[in-house]
Amino acid sequence: MGKASANNVKSDKEAAKPAAKKDENKDFQYIVRIANKDLNGERPIPLALSDLKGIGLRLGYAIAERLNLQPTKKIGELKEDEIEKLKEYVENKEYDLPDWLLNHRREPVTGKNLNLVTTDLDVQVQEDINLMKKIRSYKGIRHEKGKKVRGQRTRSNGRRGLSIGVVRKKE
């Protein structure tokens, strides 16, 4: 009985090993570069696009649908012309998608609805904060002082810096 069970265990381990990978498509790209960022080619299109700052999962699905790409398809399986189409669409700031899906609505200078990605988003957010500081809005003043901006409590939470400790009265 001992030998028979040992043989079964061995065969179970062999059965648990994953099957050898099938021959991969020669055109498969393991790294796809979009908006100056390397994306993992083994991920589905919306998930890979969500690695870009400024594009979430929902926007990734919307972009795939807009470009007639199958959302379950891996981004590395796309042809060169499809990748170029995707690059142009992502790097274009004005999307033909619903306004609520975009991250920079009613831009102050032009009034357009934009979706910014990567460094464009970082630069624009910093410019918006500097504008608030310049016009001395409540939020701008809070930013200047390094306080919380969105109405959170400041008395008990969010403390940082060195603790002062308790000072005793001198007798």
Curated annotation (Swiss-Prot):
GO-annotated molecular function: rRNA binding; structural constituent of ribosome
UniProt-annotated stretches for the region Disordered: 1-22, 142-171
InterPro entries on file: Rbsml_uS13_C, Ribosomal_uS13, Ribosomal_uS13-like_H2TH, Ribosomal_uS13_archaeal, Ribosomal_uS13_CS
A biological-process GO annotation: translation
Keyword Metal-binding set for record: no
The UniProt record lists the keyword Protease: no
Regions of compositional bias (Basic residues) in chain numbering: 142-158
Start-end of Basic and acidic residues biased regions: 10-22
Alphabetized UniProt keyword annotations: Ribonucleoprotein, Ribosomal protein, RNA-binding, rRNA-binding
SUPFAM superfamilies: S13-like H2TH domain (SSF46946)
GO cellular component, one term: cytosol
One Pfam family per UniProt: Ribosomal_S13
Quaternary context: Part of the 30S ribosomal subunit. Forms a loose heterodimer with protein S19. Forms two bridges to the 50S subunit in the 70S ribosome.
Family: Belongs to the universal ribosomal protein uS13 family.
Function: Located at the top of the head of the 30S subunit, it contacts several helices of the 16S rRNA. In the 70S ribosome it contacts the 23S rRNA (bridge B1a) and protein L5 of the 50S subunit (bridge B1b), connecting the 2 subunits; these bridges are implicated in subunit movement.
Name of the protein this chain belongs to: Small ribosomal subunit protein uS13
Organism: Thermoplasma volcanium (strain ATCC 51530 / DSM 4299 / JCM 9571 / NBRC 15438 / GSS1)
Name of the gene: rps13
